[in-house]
């Protein structure tokens, strides 16, 4: 959410559905960018190539709006009787769609939702007040952040009527290394992967560019190998490091390939107070800001709600295809 817009209009960050509607309406009708024109978007929506709700991280989707009704389209959910039900056709999804339709009818959601070719365009043009996305959305708004043009802050919103924040969880992985039954030495794949992970940080320290590192010649079996809680660990370490509670000697970098460089950068980029991650509390003019600030903002702003607040995770009960899906879809 554009914190600078909230501040300029004297609004608090929304938590409930009704509060979200109030803020979105203010962003549309009260000229939060101060240009005297009726040209702002309350809530950004997906483009014509994206999804309103998806499995996993869905930037610009409306997933939290569905989840606030405990609706999970495209997910298989275990019902009260133990059977597995498809989330797209549950009553909660109908309820969510009705409320989302109201937002759209009242022009609180992007009028060009699902028609616009690129949802990023109005976002980078400074015309959007709210969008939904994963923690790494800090990279998406990097240009506006580096220019000091927009203070984006992350929130869990909207909460469900019971006061909880529900969120669907992504699949554990979507990338695989596969050895066929004809492979004579399948253990070689494990050895290669272990070697790559073990040496990644050393190569970075030696000056190997990330562009070179992802080529197949340099990095066979390239994949994303990381701890499931990598970002939460990074948030915890960085905030404690800024607070003076730990030093680099207290951190094991062997399985955290970017954490050392993050710690080195954050002390140069963060202004006091060290627990305030507002836009004006960063050294935007630093010569290392361009290469480091987007990631630090993604972690310390984008992942803050996941670390500081409780949420109810909802998992997909079935990740395969049914016979009907195979023949009809």
Predicted regions and their residues:
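Conserved oxyanion/phosphate-binding beta-strand-loop segments in alpha/beta enzyme cores
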Residues: 51-72
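Alpha-to-beta junction loops
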Residues: 125-137
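Glycine-centered hinge/linker elements that transmit conformational signals in sensory
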Residues: 78-110, 156-160, 243-269
């Amino acid at each position: 959410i554009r914190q600078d817009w909230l501040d300029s209009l004297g609004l608090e960050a929304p938590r409930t559905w009704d509060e979200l509607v109030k803020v979105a309406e203010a962003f549309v009708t009260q000229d939060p960018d101060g240009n005297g024109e009726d040209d702002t978007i309350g809530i950004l929506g997906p483009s014509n190539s994206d999804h309103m709700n998806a499995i996993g991280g869905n930037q610009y989707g409306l997933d939290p709006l569905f989840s606030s009704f405990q609706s999970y389209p495209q997910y298989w959910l275990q019902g009260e009787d133990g059977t597995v039900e498809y989330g797209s056709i549950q009553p909660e999804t109908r309820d969510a769609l009705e409320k989302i339709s109201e937002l759209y009818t009242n022009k609180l959601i992007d009028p060009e939702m699902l028609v616009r070719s690129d949802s990023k365009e109005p976002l980078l043009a400074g015309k959007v007040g709210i969008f939904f996305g994963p923690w790494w959305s800090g990279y998406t708004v990097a240009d506006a952040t580096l220019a000091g043009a927009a203070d984006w802050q992350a929130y869990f919103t909207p909460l469900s009527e019971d006061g909880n924040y529900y969120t669907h969880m992504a699949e554990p992985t979507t990338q695989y290394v596969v050895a066929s039954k004809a492979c004579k030495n399948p253990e070689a794949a494990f050895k290669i992967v272990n070697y790559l992970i073990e040496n990644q940080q050393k190569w970075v320290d030696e000056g190997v560019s990330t562009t070179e590192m992802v080529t197949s010649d340099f990095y066979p079996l390239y994949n994303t190998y990381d701890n499931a809680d990598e970002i939460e660990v990074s948030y915890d370490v960085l905030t404690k490091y800024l607070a003076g509670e730990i030093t680099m000697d207290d951190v094991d970098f062997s399985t955290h390939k970017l954490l050392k460089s993050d710690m080195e950068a954050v002390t140069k980029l963060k202004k006091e107070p060290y627990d305030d991650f507002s836009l004006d509390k960063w050294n935007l003019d630093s010569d290392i800001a361009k290469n480091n600030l987007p990631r630090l903002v993604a972690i310390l702003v984008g992942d803050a709600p996941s670390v500081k607040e409780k949420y109810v995770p909802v998992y997909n009960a079935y990740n395969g295809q049914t016979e009907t899906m195979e023949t009809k879809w």
